[in-house]
Curated annotation (Swiss-Prot):
GO BP, one annotated term: respiratory electron transport chain
Binding site for heme b 2: H89, H190
Pfam families per record: Cytochrome_B
Role summary: Component of the cytochrome b6-f complex, which mediates electron transfer between photosystem II (PSII) and photosystem I (PSI), cyclic electron flow around PSI, and state transitions.
NCBIfam families tied to this protein: PRK03735.1
Transmembrane stretches, start-end: 35-55, 93-113, 119-139, 189-209
Membrane topology: Multi-pass membrane protein
Protein name, entry field: Cytochrome b6
Top-level lineage group: Bacteria
Molecular function terms, GO-annotated: electron transporter, transferring electrons within cytochrome b6/f complex of photosystem II activity; metal ion binding; oxidoreductase activity
Record organism: Prochlorococcus marinus (strain NATL2A)
UniProt binding sites for heme c: C38
Chief site of localization: membrane
Amino acid sequence: MANSSPVYDWFQERLEIQDIADDVTSKYVPPHVNIFYCLGGITLVCFLIQFATGFAMTFYYKPTVTEAYSSVSYLMTDVSFGWLIRSVHRWSASMMVLMLILHVFRVYLTGGFKRPRELTWITGVVMAVITVAFGVTGYSLPWDQVGYWAVKIVSGVPAAIPVIGDFMVELLRGGESVGQSTLTRFYSLHTFVMPWLLAVFMLMHFLMIRKQGISGPL
């Protein structure tokens, strides 16, 4: 590369970054691709916004049944731009779910789930389930009346499953009733387990798309 900087040359010598850049920028895009094929990318952007704003809120949120609600109130009223951070988190969560639904419809209607892209579709379905679980666990974290009763209802649903139902309810709640253990588990799921799971499946999803390319028109 003519007139390259010493820094660029240093990285190029060790990592061959120009080959990587050429591969990324020269990928063929089929002529039938339109704006509706951007819905998956928009969903990713929403997730990144969720990650950034959620990380910011962890500095102030206290995952205890006695302090959760007051810590959220403090974030909204006393922390500089705290109301904006939480509002963006909520808005982007709603937008992420909407974009995900539209993305699934687009893929289904254009046949993007067919051979040889079955695994890409399966990873997408798994990510959709994780996204719904994100919503359920996040909804409970303020630990207000709405959050408490939502947790009580949702965590009680597995009780209808034969044999293992009661065990699953106790596993979700951390005991026989909804309380501190429940909030701790939902907080851990929402801020650690699910983000990592979603990131892993996203990586698999993108690598398969990268390998197989965008599906053709109907």
